[in-house]
Amino acid sequence: MLRYIIPRKKGTFVIAAFLTVAFFCIVAYHRNDRRRTKFQFPDIEKYAEELVRLPETWNGELHQIPNYTAPREGPGEKGKPVVLTGKDAELGQADMKKWFMNVHASDKISLDRDVPDPRIQACKDIKYDYAALPKTSVIIIFTDEAWTPLLRTVHSVINRSPPELLQEVILLDDNSKRQELQEPLDEHIKRFGGKVRLIRKHVRHGLIRAKLAGAREAVGDIIVFLDSHCEANHGWLEPIVQRISDERTAIVCPMIDSISDNTLAYHGDWSLSTGGFSWALHFTWEGLSEEEQKRRTKPTDYIRSPTMAGGLLAANREYFFEVGGYDEEMDIWGGENLEISFRAWMCGGSIEFIPCSHVGHIFRAGHPYNMTGRNNNKDVHGTNSKRLAEVWMDDYKRLYYMHREDLRTKDVGDLTARHELRKRLNCKPFKWFLDNIAKGKFIMDEDVVAYGALHTVVSGTRMCTDTLQRDEKMSQLLGVFHCQGKGSSPQLMSLSKEGNLRRENTCASEENGNIRMKTCSKKAQFNERWAYENKMIRNLKSGKCMSTANLKPGDNAIVVECDEKDEHQKWNFIDPAKA
């Protein structure tokens, strides 16, 4: 790709020079070895794709923070999308496959671009006493990240952070191999006059241990972790520092705005969310609870959140290590965000979102680098999550094993140090966390009418209700399938005391003879309420009963007129492990 080797402002001259040199090299090569077969002139685009990007050499001038009040023109300015056409579009789509983001579009955007400010006026009106606030180390971990997304992260932090509050930016290179991230990166950061420190690890640590390494190197009173494909927005740092200065045990997060992985469009708004979790131990976004809405007296107040997404957070550096940092035996990435969330709340701290602080993040559909852990472990999220379940979830770890029965007996390393940490910090039980912080979290096997694999047996053939691997984040029809046993999570169902036939987050309703699973209402609607009588599952609104009549595995479940003599309508909730 010529974009990697040709500076934009010198395009015509450099192309001519490149082709001239290539021509004479080919002639010399051909003349010096007549024994070779006839030489084929290489395809210039294909050849260029093999070359590494050579960023422009630093000219010795120190970085100047842009005047964002002045008009700016150029691709992507003000967060506008970069829409590619023709050959550019082809290169961009190739990047989507390689990088899971459009690096070609990113390369057209200034490293110092302006982005829309989503803050409300009340946030902008807050005055901060910089002299009274602690200084911050911003830590950015990267491994073989694309050049412009990485550098735009750094530039945005430098450009939009008060110098009085920014102690340093630590770039921690987790064993990158790409040439442009070697000497060219060393050269690029010189323009920041020592404000940016580059620390290199020559053995892969993985994100979790690399964050710990960065935190140990930091000298600021506050540490902020950012992913390597972010853009800090206007006024992002001040409210974070102020909150941690006010409350030492608060671990806080900015509001995370979305940057398109394809067009690099910046989408920021004032919608407020909190973090939740699934019993499979994945992070989820949730709306603000009624209790939290009432607690907050003004729109600039911090938001208490049960969990955090993980990539972007800030903490008092001393407190971060006092409360246990990260579990150093967790591998690469995954699970550490819920582990620190549960631990912070249970051990006397808090997790909070700061509505006046915004940072954009490129959400990618995959990882362009190796995510395999030690001993060739390709399930690092699973094994990391088991470590947190065993240490922090008490008996509620059973709910994790409902989803990951395969990990129940798996060795995930020594947990002694983490158990001792919990004891030393005098942390509360996980039930306290559920009762006081994650209120309303549905527990499928606790305080319900019935729970288990919902199955029926007809002529010796057993079938269970099943999600059929459909995306439960969207409204989907419930299906039936052969009972899988061993706690197969897609087949687990509960009947709540409110009459909801439900899974963790979705409830069943009768719809045109089928059963639709959709996000549960706060108060069950009449068509979402069911009764379990005489082994029959009856919808209270339609009066019809769930049936497998004339169904085969993989079909959608149906409701029909109730008939107590029809064995297709007889259902049992049975122990998931025996289903």
Swiss-Prot record:
It is found in: Golgi apparatus membrane. Residues 1-12 are cytoplasmic. Residues 31-579 are lumenal. It comes from the Eukaryota. Pathway: Protein modification; protein glycosylation. Residues 302-364 are annotated as: Catalytic subdomain B. The keyword Zinc does not apply. Disulfide bonds join 123-356, 347-427, 464-483, 507-520, 545-562. Mn(2+) binds at residues 227, 229, 361. There are two conserved domains in the glycosyltransferase region: the N-terminal domain (domain A, also called GT1 motif), which is probably involved in manganese coordination and substrate binding and the C-terminal domain (domain B, also called Gal/GalNAc-T motif), which is probably involved in catalytic reaction and UDP-Gal binding. Belongs to the glycosyltransferase 2 family. GalNAc-T subfamily. PANTHER family: N-ACETYLGALACTOSAMINYLTRANSFERASE, POLYPEPTIDE N-ACETYLGALACTOSAMINYLTRANSFERASE 1. This is Probable N-acetylgalactosaminyltransferase 9.
